[in-house]
Amino acid sequence: VGDVGSRRVGNFERSYEVFAGVVPPRIRNQSTPGADEAQRDLLEIACRHHGIGTAADLADYFRIGITEARPRLAELLEAGRLQMAVVDGWSDVAYLHPEAVRPRSVAARALLSPFDPVVWFRPRAERLFGFRYRIEIYVPELKREYGYYVLPFLLGDRLVGRVDLKADRANGRLLARGVFAEEGVDTGGVAFELSIELDRLADFLGLGEVVVGSRGNLAGPLRSVRR
């Protein structure tokens, strides 16, 4: 344990101070865990947050190597801290947290950051939602499938679309340059909910107008909703 700690104080800012001022006594006075114990604790936390996941899902959450994670997961199973599960359609076995609760309904609506845990581990997002997602900021413009900076749109318990967004701060506009619906969704309903979320985002960013472009299969329905 070092003598100096750091804490975030704002966007991309950190303050450095005496370690005792950063970490509370209940944490500071605990004994330092060994590597195996720390990995077990982190994997259990990952499973609690996921509810259920494969070994790869849980290992990725705290960037633990999969070869290190597998024996720790076996130990958690033996200790009763996790349970084994089988999910239809998954090729790998899954781990279930004993306290996991399946909600009867999910009333969610959000534009997700590319770094949101829902989509960060791409294999899990594709397995759970059938949603193939890649960041295309380093892809040459003519080779991009959806756009430069595309945000997934979560509605209820599904990823129903994606939007290529740009903040035009000079003109006070939020540009939805490309708007795409996933296959099989109600485009009218999705457009209505997405319109509300775009207004919320524009307000948060201090932009006075949302401008919808013509690219994407959801652009037309979204423009119709916003007339």
Go through each PLM region and give its residues.
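Long, low-complexity intrinsically disordered regions
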Residues: V1-L111, D116-V119, R124, F131-I135, ...
